[in-house]
Design a protein with these regions (language model features):
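Conserved glycine-rich cofactor-binding loop
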Residues: 26, 33-34
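Active-site helix of classical SDR
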Residues: 140, 175-176
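C-terminal helical subdomain
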Residues: 195, 199-200, 220-260
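Residue(s) in the substrate-gating loop at a strand-loop-helix junction
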Residues: 159
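Conserved NAD(P)H cofactor-binding loop of Rossmann-fold oxidoreductase domains
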Residues: 108-113
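Substrate-binding pocket helix/loop in short-chain dehydrogenase/reductase
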Residues: 116-117, 121-129
Length: 260
């Protein structure tokens, strides 16, 4: 029997494999101290990935790392404020020096502040822009060489506000629309390198941030009627594991029961 010849390059053969195995992959998850970011980080670790947990809350991260390791999961913590360029560059240097690779980058950190247009302070707009737009943009830019080398994947955890703006959400929604634009543009630039880019637009999810929003709106907070962070994490992991012949570009996910 003669061996069938193939004209695929090694990179093409890698990209066309039946599915993406997350075991031993290096994943960086920002906003990993709570909510959706925490759920995604734990889900990736549960699939065998080496997860770098990134947040401003180091104490919370270290407790999460301790818990993960008690269950034989691989995780490490890094305190990073995405509004500070020096923090981002320090994280990148650490990843380059210790891991030397990044297979998955998940952007889940962010700021959300709601107010009517007439009263919303520009300082709030600036803070949300730096955390939700500029920080993720710079971190992705700095990690692109490692992502290209790994034919990696980038996930932007956006918001339903990234698709539709509502009253009192003008500043936040503007940053989420900007994040979608960054993801769409990046996808066009890096697909040829084997990098996949996913935007996720969750509706209201049972997280501390959502509870705060309900309090601001003077509405009863019923987390059992909302999506759970693990729901979003399951969708993200499924998309990351899809065969390399395809790409999930956007996921819009909402609670089944609308309590708002």
């Amino acid at each position: 029997m003669t061996k069938e010849m193939t004209t695929e390059s090694p990179a093409e053969q890698k990209r066309s494999s039946s599915s993406q195995n997350l075991c031993d992959r290096v994943a960086v998850v920002t906003g990993a101290s709570s909510g959706i970011g925490r759920a995604i980080a734990l889900a990736l670790a549960g699939k065998g990935a080496q997860v770098r947990l990134v947040s401003r809350k180091l104490d919370t991260l270290e407790y999460l790392v301790k818990t993960a390791r008690e269950h034989s999961l691989r995780a490490s913590a890094c305190r990073v404020d995405l509004t500070r360029d020096e923090d981002i560059h320090a994280l990148v240097a650490d990843l380059e020096g210790n891991d030397g690779r990044v297979d998955v980058l998940v952007h889940c950190a962010g700021e959300i502040r709601h107010a009517e247009h007439a009263r919303a302070p520009l300082t709030d707009f600036d803070a949300q822009y730096r955390a939700n737009v500029r920080g993720p943009y710079l971190l992705t830019q700095c990690l692109l060489p490692l992502l290209r080398a790994a034919s990696g994947q980038v996930v932007f955890i956006n918001s339903s506000s990234g698709l539709r703006a509502r009253a009192r959400s003008g500043q936040f929604a503007a940053t989420q629309h900007a994040m979608k634009a960054i993801a769409d543009s990046l996808r066009e630039e890096v697909n040829a390198d084997g990098i996949r880019v996913l935007s996720v637009f969750p509706g209201r999810t049972a997280t501390p941030r959502t509870e705060q929003l309900f309090q601001e709106e003077r509405k009863a907070y019923r987390p059992e009627l909302l999506m759970q962070p693990e729901d979003v994490a399951a969708m993200v992991v499924h998309a990351l594991k899809m065969p390399r012949t395809c790409e999930v570009t956007e996921i819009s996910i909402r609670p089944l029961f609308k309590s708002y």
